[in-house]
Amino acid sequence: MGGGKHGRGGKHGGSGKSRVWTIVLIVAAIVLVISLGVLGVIGYGYWHGTKVYDGISATSGLAKEETALADMTVNWDALREQNEDIVGWVYMPGTSIDYPIVQGENDEEYLQKDFTGSTSGLVHKGAIFLSADNAGDFSDSNSFIYGHNMNDETMFAHILAMTDQATFDAARTFYILTPTQNYRCRTYALDVVKNTETNILQPNFADEAAMRSYMTARINDSAVGAPTDVDLASVTKLFTLITCGDDYANTRAVLCGGCVEQAAPANAE
């Protein structure tokens, strides 16, 4: 009888373990399905965000094949119909940087809101925006333009990639296009700074000497070797592109560009 009881007890224990494993497998399956669903939603968010900006790029009518700076025109009226905060366009040949520039009431407005005004979804590419502390017509000596460092290598992700010397050297020119003036810029430094470092954010300078001192400081702190083809003495206007660093929350990658040519676009307002 004792043996019989033992036998029944062993069988009951096996059945209990079976139920436990069944529950574990069910929970694991549910977690897997949820995880795949979340990844799918995130993947769609990246894809959709890219499609949105591809459409905006088509609307801009930017003639990228033009070699003359004045012939690089943008359909500002069409873009204003989508967003009245439009102030310019940034384009860096050979990279994914090709976006409208907006200016919000503060520097938080377009961190999650894209050019169309949407903040929906799990992925927020936001918009490329001019600092609210800058003049909206880019009349400051140094204009600061921000964009997210996205995992799908869109928006301003390429800027962080330029901490690699070869990548930096491969794309040295970018354009800032506005309704009244077009600017061709050459990069002269790429600094990686703490997000608490504010002395880099100087929109204007007391005199030319102060501006040269600022540029020299950027070169001295550069994460890549400074090029020698930018005559600092001839540069009178700066454009600074900023994105998150590798750790996102604590550092910023700061791409410094000096204007080497400017011209009124053929459709200047």
Please name every model-derived segment.
Residues 24-40:
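Hydrophobic membrane-insertion alpha-helices, especially the h-region
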Residues 1-20:
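N-terminal Lys/Arg-rich, disordered targeting/topogenic segments
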Residues 35-269:
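Solvent-exposed, non-transmembrane regions of membrane-associated and secreted proteins
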Residues 15-21, 48, 71:
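Non-membrane alpha-helical secondary structure
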